[in-house]
From Swiss-Prot:
Pfam families, per database record: DUF697
Organism encoding this protein: Histophilus somni (strain 2336) (Haemophilus somnus)
Superkingdom, natural source: Bacteria
Protein name in UniProt: UPF0283 membrane protein HSM_0945
Membrane spanning residue stretches: 67-87, 96-116, 213-233
Amino acid sequence: MPKKVFQQEDVEQKITENFEPKQEFEQDELDIEMDCSQFETTMDRQNTDIPFQHMVRPKVTMWQKLLMATICLFSCGILAQSVQWLVDSWRDNQWIAFVFAMVSLFLVLLGLGTIIKEWRRLVQLKKRLILQEKSREIRSKSAVNLTEVSSEGKELCLKIASLMGIDDKSPQLIAWQEQVHEAYTEQEILRLFSQNVLIPFDRVAKKLISKNAVESALIVAVSPLAIVDMFFIAWRNIRLINQLAKLYGIELGYVSRLRLLRMVFVNMAFAGAAEVIQDLGLEWLSQDITAKLSARVAQGIGVGILTARLGIKAMEFCRPIAVAPEEKLRLSHIQTELLGTLKTTLFSANKVKEKVR
């Protein structure tokens, strides 16, 4: 192996090339701002939401089919027995038994009517989710398919307007119909419908979500009873989902409400709501804000963020057209108002108490 000779000057030159001149920072010049958009964009790119088709069309197992068949046979048997009891009581002149038979038949019919009503509301919810799936398919079409002009997008929008109960003479709907041109693609028609017809509904929904998030945070931050907070926040979250569903024209029954709640909570858990809260908590910690806040205020912030996350997911499920990335409501849109309201309300109250003392 040939001998290599190194010069001291060459070694020092290579070492100095790997170093950069030092930079000094003053504490006053550091300004850390909370920005959730980068984290949320990363989560969106990861595509953490549960595949939509699994929620819209879940697989029905054999046990579920057997259970539904058993319930149907049992309901038919109860109805037939009630009618038979009514006929026998009338024929035998047993008037007391006849009254009981009438009451039982009324209760059976009431129960069957409730079941049919719940089933219709479930079908309505499923139709809304299927419309969302169709809008997603239209938006995901390739550029080759977009060149084919089709009336499918316009028919879908008119069907959505009918399901939402929007009047044909509505100014927003008329403005959308005037802007639609034959040369427009399905994606452009959906975008115009969303901008002209659905944006007013989205604004009301965003106000509801922001209002409920701030109020929930204040309630938890002020209230000393954890059990009362738990039930009260649960009631307010269910009420928020009902308001959003009613806003977008969905009539929820007991079963359909449970199903919507299940889809929202499962999607929240899968999307990593805890990671969002952890990220926001680290940002607040970097600003040294948590040192000024009490434990109750920190809990209020966490509850407010969870309420906002719940409202955002419920809005995405209730909206008839899938939310586009530029239309999506983010936590960063709510956290500024949430933190500002808490600081203004609680810190001003503490200052008033100190002045009184």
